[in-house]
């Protein structure tokens, strides 16, 4: 128990205190607290420490036979005793992150309605569009500072999961707390229930969402506008993270709101920031610059294009022109290499399309320039997969890349594991252990000829908790591109590979607290420099980060009257 902090004064007692996850201590209530809060007889006699509770919980956790059951068990602890939940994650973060988030959370989303047990967060349904203010006021969390919101249309690589997508905001906010030290009392997951186009859900008698085809067009835009305005009225200083919106909505929503509210899209900007940070670390280890690389993408959706734009911005900051940087980036989708004469390019793709004149002399084997054609002609040194389609990084493609690049950098980032473009084991075997590999989902280390290769997980959890902490500590009113670039550079500075040629590309998850604080400082400093936050010295900013960093310790309680 943290005796250095002042006690919390609570106006209620008895079973009510045991049913409030944010304040429940279970068997850790002291004898004095049990008397004052009318808890005598409601708990077993023994008074435990949080570590004793966590030890029992971990023993129970290990007895479950599959990851989904482990996920459900951990969620039950979260809905019963949040402090214990986060102590358990703190003690076993590497083991449990794949359980509370990707890849297991994908299965939890698919089975959300079937496994539903208890409310968490807010569901705002389109039929209730005129009562959004009332719905927000129904939240028991009064000081919300970070919101993760989804409409469930593009959940990981699984597509439309309707309200089942709520598993993503819940899981994401668990990482804000366990990795970034954001108090769970300041977090709120929200799902915008605008219907679903998933026929399996519409026909499922257990589906708990609004049974209707998804709304779109002006109806959708007006609903999201009403939501954003209502959130700003209720919690004007809250950071809003857009999560798993479909491509057709993700970028337009970000463009519409990024200069009006404190918000960002993790799929576009968070993924870009962690990818750029990982690339910077890889380049530092090779004593080169990102601006010297030639980069091929498989997948030209909003996430892939967001990463590409962030890479180009970093290249330009290193001294090359925007035009030159764009010539070094090759975007490939199902129709082949994006070229500026293609019809129906989306707005965010147009500036990333290669000029036809630059590639018309290429020796190609297909009418549309394929990824393999790009390997032979463009000779990329970096390959990034955000296609959501498994197995597309074939042996032929990887070996073609390796013929012109001794140490290729290969990031198959698609989630969940079942959607990855190639496994690290295959990539390392095909390149004889020479590739630098990072993935979007967790993979076991690979052993080749008695050498073990740790596989870095290029996971947004390295970035967004630090961004959230930096925004909260500095009081930033916006999330700018420069703040995101600062987060990438800060992550690269934490890379073990930069200090040791045999080290991992990304830090160990056990070091995530120090990484998040380092990123938070970089983000907050840029926010202050840009005028998005009030002036503060480096010392004051660092102190604010420490003051806002929540740890999973019980507080002392005192009783007060209503």
Curated annotation (Swiss-Prot):
Keywords: Metal-binding, NAD, Oxidoreductase. It comes from the Bacteria. One of its GO terms (cellular component) is cytosol. InterPro entries: Aminoacid_DH-like_N_sf, Malic_enzyme_CS, Malic_N_dom, Malic_N_dom_sf, Malic_NAD-bd, Malic_OxRdtase, NAD(P)-bd_dom_sf, NAD_malic_enz_proteobac. The record marks 267 as: Important for activity. Pfam families: malic, Malic_M. One of its GO terms (molecular function) is oxaloacetate decarboxylase activity. Its EC number is 1.1.1.38. PROSITE patterns: MALIC_ENZYMES (PS00331). NAD(+) binds at residues 154, 267, 415. Its cofactor is Mg(2+); Mn(2+). This is NAD-dependent malic enzyme. It comes from Shewanella loihica (strain ATCC BAA-1088 / PV-4). The lineage of its organism: Bacteria, Pseudomonadati, Pseudomonadota, Gammaproteobacteria, Alteromonadales.
């Amino acid at each position: 128990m943290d005796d250095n902090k002042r006690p919390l004064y609570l106006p209620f007692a008895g079973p009510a205190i045991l049913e409030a996850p944010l304040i429940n201590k279970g068997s850790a209530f002291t004898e004095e607290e049990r008397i004052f809060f009318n808890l005598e007889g409601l708990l077993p006699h023994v008074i435990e420490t949080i570590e004793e509770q966590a030890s029992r919980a971990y023993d129970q956790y290990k007895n479950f036979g599959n990851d989904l059951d482990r996920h459900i068990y951990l969620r039950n602890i979260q809905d019963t005793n949040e402090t214990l939940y986060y102590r358990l994650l703190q003690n076993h973060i590497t083991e449990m992150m794949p359980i509370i988030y990707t890849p297991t959370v994908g299965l939890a989303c698919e089975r959300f309605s079937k496994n539903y047990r208890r409310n968490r967060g807010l569901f705002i349904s389109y039929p209730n569009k005129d009562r959004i203010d009332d719905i927000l006021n129904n939240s028991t969390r009064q000081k919300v500072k970070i919101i993760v919101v989804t409409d469930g249309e593009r959940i990981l690589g699984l597509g439309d999961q309707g309200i089942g997508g709520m598993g993503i905001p819940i899981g994401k906010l668990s990482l804000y707390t366990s990795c970034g030290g954001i108090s769970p009392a300041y977090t709120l997951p929200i799902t915008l229930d605008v219907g679903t186009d998933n026929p399996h859900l519409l026909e499922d008698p257990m589906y708990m969402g609004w049974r209707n085809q998804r709304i779109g067009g002006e109806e959708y835009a007006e609903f999201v506008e009403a939501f954003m305005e209502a959130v700003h009225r209720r919690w004007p200083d809250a950071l809003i993270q857009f999560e798993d919106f479909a491509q057709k909505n993700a970028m337009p929503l970000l463009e519409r709101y990024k200069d009006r509210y404190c918000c960002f899209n993790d799929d576009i900007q968070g993924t870009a920031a962690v990818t750029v940070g990982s690339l910077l670390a890889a380049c530092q280890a090779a004593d080169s610059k990102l601006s010297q690389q030639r980069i091929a993408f498989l997948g030209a959706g909003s996430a892939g294009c967001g990463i590409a734009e962030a890479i180009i911005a970093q290249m330009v900051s290193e001294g090359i022109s925007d035009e030159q940087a764009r010539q070094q980036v090759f975007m490939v989708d199902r129709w082949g290499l994006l070229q500026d004469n293609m019809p129906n390019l989306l707005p965010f793709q147009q500036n990333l399309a290669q000029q036809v004149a630059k590639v018309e002399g290429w020796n190609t084997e297909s009418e549309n320039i394929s990824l393999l054609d790009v390997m032979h002609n463009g000779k990329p040194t970096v390959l990034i997969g955000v296609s959501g389609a498994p197995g597309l990084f074939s042996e032929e493609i990887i070996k073609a890349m390796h013929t012109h690049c001794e140490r290729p950098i290969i990031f198959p980032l698609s989630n969940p594991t079942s959607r990855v473009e190639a496994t690290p084991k295959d990539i390392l075997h095909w390149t004889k252990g020479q590739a630098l590999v990072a993935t979007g989902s967790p993979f076991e280390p690979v052993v080749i000829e008695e050498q073990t290769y740790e596989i870095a997980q290029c996971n947004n959890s390295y970035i967004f908790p630090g961004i959230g902490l930096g925004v909260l500590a500095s009081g930033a009113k916006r999330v700018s591109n420069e703040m995101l670039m600062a987060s990438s550079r800060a992550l690269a500075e934490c890379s073990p590979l930069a200090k040791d040629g045999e080290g991992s590309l990304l830090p160990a998850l056990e070091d995530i607290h120090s990484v998040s604080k380092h990123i938070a400082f970089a983000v907050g400093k840029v926010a202050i420099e840009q005028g998005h936050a009030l002036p503060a010295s480096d010392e004051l900013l660092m102190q604010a980060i420490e003051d806002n960093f929540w740890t999973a310790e019980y507080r002392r309680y005192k009783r007060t009257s209503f």
